[in-house]
């Protein structure tokens, strides 16, 4: 018997269970190379993706397909120094940042 576990599909299923992402304004803290950012955009979220590492932000921008460019904004920064008004976002995502 062969057992195949697809971690990407498991992650997408988990995201779908958490919320209806369509049209939601989402801030992703610690976006890294943008792997999760792309998943959120595919689910319909409007994502502001933040990471303190400028190299990772550049890599994330390069990986993002053009069709999602209007759904995602990348910023170099940290959670401690957000310059966004209260209630700017519907949801916040922190994944793999600790």
Task: Name each model-derived stretch.
Residues 80-91:
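A short acidic, Gly/Pro-enriched loop at the edge of an enzyme's catalytic core
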Residues 33-81:
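Class I SAM-dependent methyltransferase SAM/SAH-binding core
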């Amino acid at each position: 018997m062969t057992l195949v576990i697809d971690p990407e599909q498991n992650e997408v299923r988990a995201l779908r269970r958490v919320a209806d992402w369509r049209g939601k304004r989402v801030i992703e803290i610690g976006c890294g190379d943008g792997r999760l950012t792309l998943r959120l955009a595919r689910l319909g979220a409007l994502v502001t993706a933040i990471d303190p590492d400028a190299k990772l932000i550049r890599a994330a921008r390069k990986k993002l397909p053009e069709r999602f460019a209007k759904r995602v904004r990348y910023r170099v920064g940290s959670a401690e120094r957000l310059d966004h008004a209260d209630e700017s976002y519907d949801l916040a995502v922190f994944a793999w940042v600790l």
